[in-house]
Amino acid sequence: MIEAEENTLALPRTLVLVGLMGAGKTCIGRRLAQMAGVPFVDADVEIERAAKRTIAEIFATYGESEFRALERRVMARLLAGRTCVLATGGGAFMAEDTRALIRLHGLSLWLRADLDLLVARTAGRTHRPLLNNGDAREKLAELMAKRHPVYAEADIVFDALDESQDASALRVRSCLLSYLADHAETAP
């Protein structure tokens, strides 16, 4: 469990977590939001609310391009709102206009995880449309090759490990505090 003195984090603006599925955006994001005393928002949940359909249904009915267009609109709305910890879908940061919005209104943090960890964390999950057809390991490797160069544009790069969620959250907090100190950002 996280100790009380380690349970604080002042965010000057929305913290946007990016990375592949299984990197820990949701689990770590919830703990960071608790530390910062701000809401945790899962962009995928907000997309499902806006569409009144699951992500899998959106993909199946409308295809990936329509999903990405909806994702961009929802991200713009969320970034214009109050400060929060925002977990994005794995592909959200790939869109240049979304990255520009994040640069303007948020602080991006890439949760970088190795292939074995991603495979272990996503095994048997059926709510991930991009992994439902074919070999998940191969698909994740392809996504890593395509997305990692773009994810590297994030303000902060954090290496996710196979450790407890509390341990990861504390390490992310340490990275954030160092980044904020180095960049002289303070909470409003």
Curated annotation (Swiss-Prot):
Q: Which residues form the signal peptide?
A: none
InterPro entries with a match to the protein in the record? P-loop_NTPase, Shikimate/glucono_kinase, Shikimate_kinase/TSH1, Shikimate_kinase_CS
Which GO MF terms are attached to this record?
Answer: ATP binding; magnesium ion binding; shikimate kinase activity
Task: Write down the EC number.
Answer: 2.7.1.71
* One annotated GO biological process: aromatic amino acid family biosynthetic process
Q: Which gene encodes it?
A: aroK
Q: What note does UniProt attach to the cofactor annotation?
A: Binds 1 Mg(2+) ion per subunit.
Q: Where in the cell is it found?
A: Cytoplasm
Sorted keywords for this record are: Amino-acid biosynthesis, Aromatic amino acid biosynthesis, ATP-binding, Cytoplasm, Kinase, Magnesium, Metal-binding, Nucleotide-binding, Transferase
Organism per entry:
Rhodospirillum rubrum (strain ATCC 11170 / ATH 1.1.1 / DSM 467 / LMG 4362 / NCIMB 8255 / S1)
Q: Write down the chemical reaction(s) this protein catalyses.
A: shikimate + ATP = 3-phosphoshikimate + ADP + H(+)
Cofactor(s) for this protein? Answer: Mg(2+)
Q: Spell out the protein name for this chain.
A: Shikimate kinase
Binding positions for substrate per the UniProt entry: 44, 68, 90, 147
Q: Which parts of the sequence bind ATP?
A: 22-27, 128
Cystine bridges: none
Task: Give the function comment from the record.
Answer: Catalyzes the specific phosphorylation of the 3-hydroxyl group of shikimic acid using ATP as a cosubstrate.
Query: Is Metal-binding one of the keywords?
Result: yes
**Stated family:** Belongs to the shikimate kinase family.
Task: Spell out the subunit comment.
Answer: Monomer.
Listed binding positions for Mg(2+) are 26
* One cellular component term from this protein's GO annotations in UniProt: cytosol
